[in-house]
């Protein structure tokens, strides 16, 4: 199979040029002007469009069971939505397994979930839900099998204490793995939540008030210090929602600590006023939406390079699930928002088209740095000879209004309903195969491949 993309502006993290792109057998073979292939091929005219590396979303939750509910996107509907939004690779955060289970247990479960359903290429982050000698001894074997990142939680059912975190940080560092962490102070949250519930204050806005930004920022600072104590272990902070936490990360970077951070479109474009709407329960996620001032601080981090990655934390529960389970009580509502289909378009529209970031910085945030950090570079995250032919073509001249009825996930709403975006995703190619074109999904379940990722190598800070 040969595909020639002509007349587009090909953009990588280190530059852009108007040139053609030739893909053969799923691999980029040539970039240049006026490429004339010797053999017949499909030609795609990208005149006036940007040709970007396919998106790499390193934070999704497909088919996750959170105890009170199972998310409504599995690995088919979730990756279908990703493909239609220009994302060609996902790394899914596996959910918790049975109490006392080994690391391999969840890997086998999740490979079963994805094997015959994933539309695009995929991998998983390991999840460490308890610490003992067997778990610590298993980590190097998991890294050898291609899982080079693991998640720790400082809140929820399987939160780790500081001693357990230190043990995990040390062993992950020694084994060539990157530690990722959900940082919130669980004790402080529990205290605030109990206070509100006792007073009968259970409306959605009290979800945000029960998880103030200081709970997140304190946990970020604590993880930075613990990583330093653990031998300067590399650390990746997921779903940053506030500027104080970013300040702590800037300080760590100034002290040459190997720390990286992601944020998500919801923290850049939605704010806490959503909780006071009639459908406020559909915006319940953790950490919660913040105020506009915190948004501005995050945009500064996007613009100046302090934030490394924009992912989604896609975790979809329908409004029917939310209403039936919560019965109006924020503390009972399953947490998470859909968004895997909208990430690329939202950041392109609100970032590139407003002049906040360059097209090159867009690539850095959405594909290049995610691929570097998580052991996929240069197979993913770049359009260069030898890399996978994963491509998203965006037409900056088109304007689109987001409406859930046109999306491809399995939710029954979108938090982005009514948002108008400048720039439209017109085609997505995965390993040279068109899987989305002009509003129509053209891929198929099961074509996605499991990616064995390389051990962690820190990008230059």
Swiss-Prot record:
List of residues binding substrate: 156, 286, 335
Pfam families from the UniProt entry: Amidohydro_1
GO terms of molecular function: hydrolase activity, acting on carbon-nitrogen (but not peptide) bonds, in cyclic amides; metal ion binding
Cofactor(s) the protein needs: a divalent metal cation
Keywords of this entry: Hydrolase, Metal-binding
Post-translation changes: Carboxylation allows a single lysine to coordinate two divalent metal cations.
Keyword RNA-binding listed: no
Highest taxon, organism lineage: Bacteria
Cofactor detail note: Binds 2 divalent metal cations per subunit.
Positions of post-translational N6-carboxylysine modification: 151
Reaction catalysis annotation: D-5-phenylhydantoin + H2O = N-carbamoyl-D-phenylglycine + H(+)
Binding site for a divalent metal cation 1: 59, 61, 151, 313
Transmembrane segments: none
Protein residues bound to a divalent metal cation 2: 151, 182, 239
Disulphide-bonded residues: none
Chain's role: Catalyzes the stereospecific hydrolysis of the cyclic amide bond of D-hydantoin derivatives with an aromatic side chains at the 5'-position. Has no activity on dihydropyrimidines. The physiological function is unknown.
Entry protein name: D-phenylhydantoinase
Organism from which the protein derives: Escherichia coli O81 (strain ED1a)
This protein's encoding gene: hyuA
């Amino acid at each position: 199979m040969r595909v020639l993309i002509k007349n587009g502006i090909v953009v990588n993290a280190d530059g852009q040029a108007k040139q053609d792109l030739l893909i053969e057998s799923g691999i980029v073979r040539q970039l240049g002007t006026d490429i004339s292939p010797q053999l017949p091929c499909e030609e795609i005219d990208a005149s006036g469009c940007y040709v970007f590396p396919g998106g790499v979303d390193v934070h999704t939750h497909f088919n996750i069971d959170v105890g009170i509910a199972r998310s409504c996107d599995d690995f088919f509907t979730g990756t279908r939505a990703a493909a239609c939004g220009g994302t060609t690779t996902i790394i899914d955060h596996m959910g918790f397994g049975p109490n006392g289970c080994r690391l391999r247990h969840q890997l086998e479960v999740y490979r079963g979930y994805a094997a015959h359903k994933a539309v695009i290429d995929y991998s998983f982050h390991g999840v460490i839900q308890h610490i003992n000698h067997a778990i610590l001894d298993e980590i190097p074997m998991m890294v050898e099998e291609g899982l080079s990142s693991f998640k720790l939680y400082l809140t929820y059912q399987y939160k780790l204490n500081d001693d357990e975190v230190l043990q995990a940080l040390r062993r992950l560092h020694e084994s060539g793995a990157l530690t990722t962490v959900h940082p919130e102070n669980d004790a402080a949250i529990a205290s605030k939540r109990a206070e509100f519930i006792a007073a009968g204050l259970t409306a959605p806005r009290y979800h945000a008030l029960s998880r103030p930004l200081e709970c997140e920022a304190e946990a970020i600072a604590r993880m930075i210090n613990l990583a330093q104590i653990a031998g300067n272990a590399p650390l990746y902070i997921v779903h940053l929602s506030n500027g104080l936490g970013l300040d702590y990360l800037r300080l760590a970077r100034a002290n040459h600590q190997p720390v990286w951070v992601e944020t998500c479109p919801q923290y850049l474009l939605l704010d806490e006023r959503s909780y006071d709407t009639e459908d406020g329960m559909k915006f319940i996620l953790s950490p919660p939406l913040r105020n506009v001032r915190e948004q501005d601080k995050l945009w500064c981090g996007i613009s100046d390079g302090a934030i490394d990655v924009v992912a989604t934390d896609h975790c979809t529960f329908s409004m029917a699930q939310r209403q039936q389970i919560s019965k109006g009580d924020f503390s009972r509502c399953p947490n998470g928002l859909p968004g895997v289909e909208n990430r690329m378009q939202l950041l392109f529209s609100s970032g590139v088209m407003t002049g906040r970031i360059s097209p090159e910085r867009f690539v850095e945030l959405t594909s290049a740095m995610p691929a570097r950090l998580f052991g996929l570079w240069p197979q993913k995250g770049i359009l260069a000879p030898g890399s996978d032919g994963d491509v998203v073509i965006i037409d900056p001249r088109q304007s689109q209004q987001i409406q859930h009825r046109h999306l491809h996930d399995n939710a029954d709403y979108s938090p982005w309903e009514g948002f108008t975006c400048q720039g439209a995703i017109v085609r997505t190619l995965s390993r040279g195969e068109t899987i989305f074109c002009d509003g129509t999904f053209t891929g198929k379940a099961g074509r996605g491949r499991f990616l064995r990722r390389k051990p962690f190598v820190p990008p230059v800070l």
